[in-house]
Regions:
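Extended amphipathic ligand-handling, pore-lining, and cofactor/metal-binding catalytic surfaces
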Residues: 1-260
Length: 260
């Protein structure tokens, strides 16, 4: 008899507030959408798991979590990543899941990242436009993590969708890649921006994100935009806090495809 289960696999974070506001809402939405099925969470970062363990907080990898579900009698599992784009982290996660596929005789299914296609990008743009109403002479710098390769185009697709909807007050930046903070600052100055809000284009605003975006040092994004004459603040809410983001992840879990 087939028994289904579902796993939500995010990078994880050491910031307690971020786990509550950015990861928990997505996990709860998935658990509600698949009510009645065994549900578990996994953190893909070994570094995060190790440091949480030192605090007495238990967490498991995707492989460990899938193995546990199989041991409990789950024969068909859905693994929904909390990733934003199909970059290196996606490849590693897919490989980790693939290694457990034989444990699920009725199939192991893998959901897509948040920004997998144009529909996702448009829905993400709608969620951002609703969450951040426009203000006179004010811009919003959406800062993604950045990846190697073509996956970064997904970040640009969100901003393009915002611009197509008339929200030209949104600009894109990447922590690892281009445009970087200085390039974003120059663009905002050219556009006549007097003030700006930096908003993470990541599931969670973890400790390193907070340092790089909102830190007091001269190298942080907030400091660099302020140095360019733009009065800048930074919101530390990750994408996981937006209901529209949970909706995309739930849809992707429902559309998950079998690993072959």
């Amino acid at each position: 008899m087939m028994r289904e289960g579902i796993v939500f696999a995010s990078y994880g974070t050491l910031v307690d507030e971020a786990r509550r506001t950015d990861i928990a809402p997505v996990a709860e939405a998935l658990a509600d959408a698949f009510a009645g099925l065994p549900f578990a969470e996994a953190y893909t970062s070994a570094w995060v798991r190790e440091h949480l363990a030192k605090r007495g907080i238990a967490s498991t990898s995707l492989g460990e979590t899938l193995a546990s579900l199989a041991d409990e009698g789950v024969t068909r599992a859905i693994a929904q990543p909390g990733l934003i784009v199909c970059g290196d982290a996606w490849d590693k996660l897919a490989a980790e899941a693939q290694a457990l596929a034989e444990r699920f005789p009725d199939g192991l299914l893998l959901g897509r990242p948040l920004l997998a296609d144009e529909q996702d990008q448009e829905e993400m743009a709608e969620a951002l436009a609703e969450a951040f109403p426009g203000r006179t002479s004010h811009s919003f710098a959406r800062v993604g993590h950045g990846t190697k390769g073509v996956a970064d185009a997904a970040y640009a697709g969100v901003v393009e969708a915002l611009h197509a909807a008339g929200r030209t007050d949104f600009a894109l930046g990447l922590m690892e890649g281009t445009p970087d903070a200085d390039e974003v600052a120059k663009k905002l100055v050219r556009n006549g921006t007097h003030s700006a809000t930096i908003v993470p284009l990541m599931l969670t605003a973890g400790s390193h994100v907070r340092r790089q975006l909102a830190g007091e040092g001269a190298a942080s994004w907030t400091s660099r935009l302020n140095a360019a004459g733009i009065a800048t603040d930074c919101t530390l809410a990750g994408l996981g806090s937006l209901p529209g983001v949970s909706a995309i992840f739930v849809r992707h879990a429902r559309e998950a495809e079998a690993i072959r």
